[in-house]
Every structure is written in structure tokens, then in C-alpha cells.
């Protein structure tokens, strides 16, 4: 799903750079699909990887967003706690020819409005 979404965005905006903020959902999914997530996320120009949204799950020892992050080959990548996202976004430089997307099934959607408003002030 992530790979298909990012590929579609690339096709829609072929001359633009792609920046993605991704929040993994569930410890079990992160554990089971870390390699696939890393491969899909390596196709962006800049990656902001957030901590795992646990939903109903308890943490699994050794399962953090780091297991995805270490295998991502995107040219620029950063690992953040979701509480750090807005401060990070205040300092990020996005070019005119850049698309920014949020991806995830956790609570990353609550950042869409604030990020959009922030990016408008930078335009």
C-alpha cells in the first residue's frame, strides 16, 4: 500500500521531490513488515519517520521505528518522536518543486492541518 501510494505520487508529480512523514502502526506490523516498509520508504527524497503508534498493543522488546530506519536508503532521513514533528517542520526547507505527504494509520492525520498551515506560511 505504501509503495503503491508513493509510486502514484511520483507519477502524478514526476519533476518534483517527494518528502514523506511516516508513522508505523502497531508493533506487530512494524516487526513483520519492517523490511517492506524500509524498501517502500527508500523511494522518497526525504523521510521523516515517527515512532510507532501502538493502538491496542503493548510494546515488543526490540521493536521500534529504528528497525525500519536503519534500512531506509532515502538520501535524507530523520527519526523523530511525534511530539517533535511540528518543531522539526518549522525548520525544514521544502522547495517549490516538492510534494509533502503524511502516511500512516495511527494519529498522524491530526498533524495534516497544522502542517498544511505551517507550509502555507513558508510559501
Predicted segments with their positions:
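ATP-dependent carboxylate-amine ligase
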Residues: 1-123
Amino acid at each position: 500500500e505504501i509503495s503503491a501510494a508513493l509510486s502514484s505520487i511520483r507519477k502524478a508529480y514526476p519533476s518534483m521531490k517527494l518528502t514523506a512523514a511516516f508513522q508505523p502502526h502497531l508493533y506487530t506490523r512494524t516487526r513483520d513488515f519492517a523490511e517492506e516498509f524500509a524498501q517502500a520508504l527508500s523511494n522518497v527524497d526525504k523521510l521523516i519517520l515517527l515512532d510507532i503508534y501502538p493502538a491496542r498493543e503493548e510494546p515488543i522488546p526490540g521493536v521500534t521505528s529504528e528497525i525500519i530506519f536503519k534500512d531506509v536508503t532515502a538520501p535524507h532521513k530523520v527519526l523523530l518522536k511525534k511530539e517533535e514533528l511540528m518543531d522539526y517542520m518549522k525548520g525544514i526547507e521544502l522547495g517549490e518543486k516538492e510534494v509533502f505527504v503524511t502516511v500512516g494509520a495511527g494519529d498522524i492525520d491530526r498533524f495534516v492541518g497544522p502542517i498544511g498551515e505551517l507550509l502555507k506560511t513558508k510559501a
